[in-house]
């Protein structure tokens, strides 16, 4: 379907709105500069972004007593792309609000493509990505693989979290077989349930003393898990659709929470598919960690692991060293890249 062309009047209105936004940002920057030069803001302080609301941020910092306080801050016009988890330099005003003047170097950043295919940061300075899936809605292995590839591309440690294990049959479950395969590859798999006593013990241990981010389909129970992990927080929990068994989105902005036992958790808006269109084929292959010993050992340097003779990956699949299901998942992802 071709895109609808804008009329001359519509283009003028769009350009006018964009110009007004740019002018407001410039006026705000001038006010900030004037206030900073006049000493209306206090000295520079260190803080961490705990939530993002458009042109304003929620920044957490210690007060004079060492207690953590959160302040609503706005950004200098020359600062773009700040996300929850960023460590920043900011200055506070007399009314408790503030202005963020700089971002400190990131240790890690989680990015995913936006609607235009441009990489957009989601969270920063995180130690592990918790990929949450559930017995219901039923997880699809290829979707799990997409999350794993995306995590491997960032260099951030992924952990698989199976939620709603109280719904899992004791024996004969295909899901149990799937989890065993991921464990055999080398991934950590954590079981969780909000309906069973001690059902979150393993998850608590996994989260302690780390900054983690939850990702996963809507409806897998992320908000319910956080409600239990953070009993003082009240998060709206969406109900599963009786028809599609797909969940409703319950979180609208990425937010950082402190866990009672130590560590932090960043909850980000639910997504149903993790786009990988920004990756090249060789990056996808690297994201399948069991492929790595065989990459670079094909007969041809430009082997695409299709029908080429002497393909080390295909030979490994035939020997049973690589699961055929994982190789098929890889091919499905790579084939999707060719249509972008």
Swiss-Prot record:
Biased composition (Basic and acidic residues): 20-34
Chain sites annotated for binding GTP: 163-166, 216-224
Disordered, as annotated region: 20-42
Cofactor descriptive note: Binds 1 zinc ion per subunit.
Cofactor entry: Zn(2+)
UniProt xrefs under CDD domains: YjeQ_EngC
One CC-aspect GO term: cytoplasm
Domain of life: Bacteria
Pfam families: RsgA_GTPase
Disulfide bond annotation, renumbered to this chain: none
Location(s), subcellular: Cytoplasm
Binding site for Zn(2+): 298, 303, 305, 311
Subunit comment: Monomer. Associates with 30S ribosomal subunit, binds 16S rRNA.
HAMAP family referenced in this protein's UniProt entry, alphabetically: GTPase_RsgA
Name of the protein: Small ribosomal subunit biogenesis GTPase RsgA
């Amino acid at each position: 379907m071709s895109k609808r062309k804008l009329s001359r009047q519509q283009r003028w209105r769009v350009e006018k709105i964009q110009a007004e936004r740019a002018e407001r940002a410039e006026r705000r920057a001038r006010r900030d500069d004037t206030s900073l030069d006049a000493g209306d803001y206090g000295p520079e302080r260190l803080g961490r972004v705990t939530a993002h609301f458009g042109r304003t941020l929620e920044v957490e910092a210690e007060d004079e007593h060492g207690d953590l306080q959160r302040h609503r801050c706005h950004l200098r016009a020359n600062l773009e792309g700040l996300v929850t988890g960023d460590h920043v330099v900011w200055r506070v005003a007399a009314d408790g609000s503030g202005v963020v003047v700089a971002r400190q170097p990131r240790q890690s950043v989680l990015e995913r493509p936006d609607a235009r295919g441009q990489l957009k940061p989601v969270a920063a300075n995180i130690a592990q990505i918790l990929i949450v899936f559930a017995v219901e809605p039923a997880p699809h292995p290829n979707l799990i693989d997409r999350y794993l590839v995306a995590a491997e591309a960032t260099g951030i440690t992924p952990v698989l979290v199976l939620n709603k294990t109280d719904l899992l049959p004791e024996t004969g479950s295909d899901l149990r077989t799937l989890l065993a395969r991921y464990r055999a590859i080398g991934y950590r798999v954590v079981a969780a349930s909000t309906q069973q006593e001690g059902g979150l013990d393993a998850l608590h241990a996994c989260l302690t003393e780390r900054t983690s981010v939850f990702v996963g389909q809507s409806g897998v129970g992320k908000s319910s898990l956080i409600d239990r992990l953070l009993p003082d927080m009240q998060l709206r929990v969406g109900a599963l659709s009786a028809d599609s068994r797909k969940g409703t989105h319950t979180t609208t902005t990425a937010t950082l929470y402190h866990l009672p036992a130590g560590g932090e958790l960043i909850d980000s808006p639910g997504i149903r598919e993790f786009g990988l269109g920004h990756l090249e084929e060789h990056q996808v292959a690297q994201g399948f960690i069991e492929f790595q010993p065989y990459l670079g050992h094909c007969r041809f340097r430009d082997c695409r692991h299709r029908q080429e003779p002497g393909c080390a990956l295909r030979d490994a699949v035939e020997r049973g060293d690589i699961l055929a299901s994982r190789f098929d998942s890889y091919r499905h992802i790579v084939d999707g890249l060719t249509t972008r």
